[in-house]
């Protein structure tokens, strides 16, 4: 399975080759975090996504080239994706069968930030539930931006933390929405945390765990862990 490739330009600009190639090979492919939230053409009503451009395109490219049902397209979600209902939308509207929960920032100690140079986009991301710094809705910030005092905001994704009750509830919600397979992606954290992820995944019937590498991975990796 190809691990999560999310909203970055590297993924977006090369998605056709990745999706079609992995589908023809019968290899699973994971759509990473923030794809819905960063899609400025996505339709979000009352805090929940009802239509998308980017996610729909990514899923369809894979599905259209699958052979005899081999492989799988997987939709990953972080905190913001979950609040937007991205996985429920993918399952119900796009026919996705596999979803992946994400703890932390995978192989990264911290991170999840993106530079936003367009004030209107920063404001929309704030409305969609992201942490945007400085606050793009502040009158003082708007004035300073228009004067050229600064030229970009930072969008931050929240670090996914979990308690057992909430984890069990989320797995059940995804099953009820129609997900056939539920995966978990976590990092190479403390042995106690790895043991917890394995124990809970077994207890609540998850189908696959991905342990993101401490010596590699994506984004700001590798880090000494």
Spans of features found by a protein language model:
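N-terminal capping/small domains of soluble enzymes
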Residues: 1-125
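Residue-level detector of functional hotspots within protein domains
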Residues: 13, 85-89, 145, 153, ...
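Glycine-rich, proline-tolerant flexible connector loops at the mouths of alpha/beta enzymes
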Residues: 32-49, 103-106, 131-132, 137, ...
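Serine/threonine-rich low-complexity intrinsically disordered regions
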Residues: 51, 115-118, 135-138, 164, ...
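Short low-complexity stretches enriched in small and charged residues
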Residues: 53-58, 136-141, 162-169
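Sequence-level detector for tyrosine residue identity
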Residues: 62, 70, 89, 130, ...
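Carboxylate/His-rich catalytic cores and anion/metal-binding grooves
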Residues: 111-116, 123-133, 196-211
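Glycine-rich phosphate/ribose-binding loops and adjacent secondary-structure elements
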Residues: 147-225
